[in-house]
């Protein structure tokens, strides 16, 4: 890969431009992600266990009826679904990573829990009137483009029973206040991105016109082949969220601040059908 090729990749990026590869379906990276999910001390693929517990306790207070059929979108290896099942919920979990789903299924089997897991893209879900609570945690809602968000909201509305709620968290403007638009590079003999030696060029950008951010990584191997990973996210205000969900006939939108320990850049929302 020549210098001019790198510059071309980084030049004139448009909102929602995609990378060349997906992290979630790469077998090697999937193993690294699972390790990050399961490390209780860090906020990497999942939040640290203190904040997971605080979130679970809050969700537990949002019960809407005695059925409590709950769906976790982007459930990962089951950090939330496992505990919610133990607390008496009828739990289902969808995730795009087969590696995470297989791990979650094994945990449920070992602990004798009846949790329904599926490896799937939640943008294609077709459930109707099945759930009282649908949740989406770790700011996953914000990674979607505008069209994808609208598609997901339609799916969620259809899948919820009357009076059911959608619970999610998102970045807020305080995240942008602390965002450092920057570039960095790393040389590794083998690490997170691949087992063999590589150089990784990383960049963080702010796209104010879409209230979005981009984190991108160009991973270059020993023979100058490369993979480009792009991760978009968005930050929302209460007004943004109201506009999105009221357009799809949701009736009540509530926001909750201060749920996470030492992190005021994330807001939680409860949306009622």
Where are these regions (language model features)?
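Conserved class I S-adenosyl-L-methionine
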Residues: 2-65
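Conserved SAM-binding loop of SAM-dependent methyltransferases across substrates and taxa
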Residues: 77-87
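Conserved SAM/SAH-binding beta-strand->alpha-helix loop
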Residues: 97-99
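A short acidic, Gly/Pro-enriched loop at the edge of an enzyme's catalytic core
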Residues: 126-134
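A short glycine-rich, Lys/Arg-flanked "PGG" loop and its adjoining helix->strand segment in the class I
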Residues: 150-162
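Conserved beta-strand signature within the Rossmann-like core of class I S-adenosyl-L-methionine
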Residues: 163-170
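SAM-dependent methyltransferase
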Residues: 170-239
